[in-house]
Amino acid sequence: MATYVSPCFTPSDSRLLTVLRKNVLPENHLGRLNSIRTIDSKKNRVVVAAQKSESSPIRNSPRHYQSQAQDPFLNLHPEISMLRGEGTSTIVNPRKETSSGPVVEDFEEPSAPSNYNEARIKVIGVGGGGSNAVNRMIESEMSGVEFWIVNTDIQAMRMSPVLPDNRLQIGKELTRGLGAGGNPEIGMNAARESKEVIEEALYGSDMVFVTAGMGGGTGTGAAPVIAGIAKAMGILTVGIATTPFSFEGRRRTVQAQEGLASLRDNVDTLIVIPNDKLLTAVSQSTPVTEAFNLADDILRQGVRGISDIITIPGLVNVDFADVRAIMANAGSSLMGIGTATGKSRARDAALNAIQSPLLDIGIERATGIVWNITGGSDLTLFEVNAAAEVIYDLVDPTANLIFGAVVDPALSGQVSITLIATGFKRQEEGEGRTVQMVQADAASVGATRRPSSSFRESGSVEIPEFLKKKGSSRYPRV
C-alpha cells in the first residue's frame, strides 16, 4: 500500500521531509508539502523520510548509529529510521495508548512478488482421496504450486501437512465436520453451501487442478461443484480423478461413473486414472496400502508433469498461454507415464509412456499433446531428440504439441516422461460419437493391448508393431 502525505501536513521539526533516494515535489511558500506519490523501486511503495544533513555519517558505520541515538527528532519519530531502512519496522505510537500501554504498530508492508507474470497454480484435493494425493505431493517436496484440501471430515483435515489456512472445511452446517458418509449428494450440497469461501480460495488463480478419488461422498459430489466455480471464474481448470478398484464394490463404481460425468461437464480437461489399470503395474504380492499409494503417486506425476512445464525454467521455454491453448475446453484426456534407465533410457521412457496401462486408447486420435521429459544434469540433446521421435512419429501431423524439458539433478541416470493427450471429446463429437463409446470400445479390446514395458519384471523394452511399420521420422535428427 502506498503512503500519502497530506498537502495540509506541516512537519513539527524545522527540517524538511523528503523522499529517500528520490526526487520530491518542491514545497509551497507556506512551508507545506505537496502530495508525494513516489514509488520505491525495490519495494514498490511510497516512502517518506527526513532529509539527511550534509554531515550525515556513512550508513552502517558505528558513528551513524551513535548520531541516530543522540538525535531527539529520530527518537520522537522512529518511523523515519524505519523508512530509511534503519532499525526495525516496529514502531511504538505514543499517541495511541490503551490500558496496557502504548500501541505497537508494524509498518512493514508485504513485498511485491519477484515476478508478477508468474502463473499462479493451485492444486485442490477434494475429499479423502484427493487430500491423500495432495499430502503425497507435499511429501515429495513438489514446488511451484499452492496446495489446498477441501473436505467435510474435519478430523481427516487435521492430519494433513497442508497449511492450516489452506484447509477448507465445507458444509459446516450440513455435516458438522463429520463427513459425507459416502453420499455424493451430501458432498455436493456441502460445496454449494460453502460457495463463497470456495470462491475466495480460488481467487487469483490462473490454473487449478481439482484432484479427487471418485466413488465416495465428498470427492464425488463436491469436486464437480468446485471445478464449476473455478471455470466460471475464468480459471483454466483441470480435473484429475481416480476410479475405484473393483474390489471396492459396485456401489462405489456406479457413483464414480456418475461423478465423472458431472466433473467432465465442469472442467476444461479431465484426466481419469482407473485404479484397476494399476493392477497391471504391480506384482501379485503388492500390499493394498502400496496399491493405493501408487494411485496417489500417479496423480502426483500427472500434476507435476503439467505444472513443471509452466513453473520450472527448462531447456525449452513454454508459456502458460501455450498450455492453455491446448488444455482449454479440451474435454476428456489421457495420461501416460514412462521412466527408464540405461543407454537408451530416453527412447525407452517414451515407449513406456505411450504404452502406459493408463492409456485406454492410442494417442493417435488426440488433437493436442502436452509432454514433458525430465532428466538429470547428464540429459543430452540427443536423448531429447530420441524421445521426441517416438512421440512425434505416432501422433497426428496436425495435432498441436507442447513440449517441455526439465533438468532435475536428483534424477541422475534416469529419464522420466509424462504425456497428456487431449482433444478426444471434440474429435469424437465431430464424428457423431461420444467419448464414453470410444472408451467402451477401447475397454472391450483392452485385453489385446500390450502392457507397458516399464512394468515388466524383466525390464526389457519391445518396440510395438505400429512403430515398426512407421517410415522415416518427421522429427529432425540431431
Curated annotation (Swiss-Prot):
Xref: InterPro entries: Cell_div_FtsZ, Cell_div_FtsZ_CS, FtsZ/CetZ, FtsZ_C, Tub_FtsZ_C, Tubulin/FtsZ-like_C, Tubulin/FtsZ_2-layer-sand-dom, Tubulin/FtsZ_GTPase_sf
In-chain residues carrying the UniProt-annotated modification Phosphothreonine: T286
Keywords attached to this entry: Chloroplast, GTP-binding, Membrane, Nucleotide-binding, Phosphoprotein, Plastid, Thylakoid, Transit peptide
Inducers of expression: Slightly induced by gibberellic acid (GA).
Residues where GTP binds: G128, G129, G130, S131, N132, G217, T218, G219, E248, R252, D296
Residue numbers carrying Phosphoserine: S143
Regulation: GTPase activity is enhanced by ARC3.
GO CC terms: chloroplast; chloroplast stroma; chloroplast thylakoid; chloroplast thylakoid membrane; contractile ring; endoplasmic reticulum
Region annotation Disordered: where it falls in the sequence: 86-112
Location(s) in or outside the cell: Plastid, Chloroplast stroma; Plastid, Chloroplast thylakoid membrane
Coiled-coil residue windows: none
A UniProt-annotated Pfam family: Tubulin
GO molecular function: GTP binding; GTPase activity; protein homodimerization activity
Knockout mutant characteristics: Reduced number of heterogeneous large chloroplast population (small and large plastids) due to impaired plastid division. Increased plastid volume in young leaf primordia and in the shoot apical meristem (SAM), including the central zone as well as peripheral zone of L1, the outermost layer, the peripheral zone of L2, and the peripheral zone of L3.
UniProt subunit comment: Aggregates to form a contractile ring-like structure; contraction of the ring was accompanied by an increase in the filament turnover rate. Self-interacts and binds to FTSZ1 in heteromers to form two morphologically distinct types of filaments, termed type-I (smooth filaments) and -II (rough filaments), in a GTP-dependent manner; the GDP-induced disassembly is inhibited by ARC6. Interacts (via C-terminus) with ARC6; this interaction enables ARC3 binding to FTSZ2. Part of a complex made of ARC3, ARC6, FTSZ1 and FTSZ2. Binds to MCD1 in an ARC6-dependent manner. Binds to CDP1/PARC6.
Family: Belongs to the FtsZ family.
Protein purpose: Exhibits GTPase activity which converts GTP ligands to GDP. Component of the plastid division machinery consisting in a binary fission accomplished by the simultaneous constriction of the FtsZ ring on the stromal side of the inner envelope membrane, and the ARC5 ring on the cytosolic side of the outer envelope membrane. Required for plastid division in a dose-dependent manner.
Listed name of the protein: Cell division protein FtsZ homolog 2-1, chloroplastic
Organism: Arabidopsis thaliana
Organism lineage string: Eukaryota, Viridiplantae, Streptophyta, Embryophyta, Tracheophyta
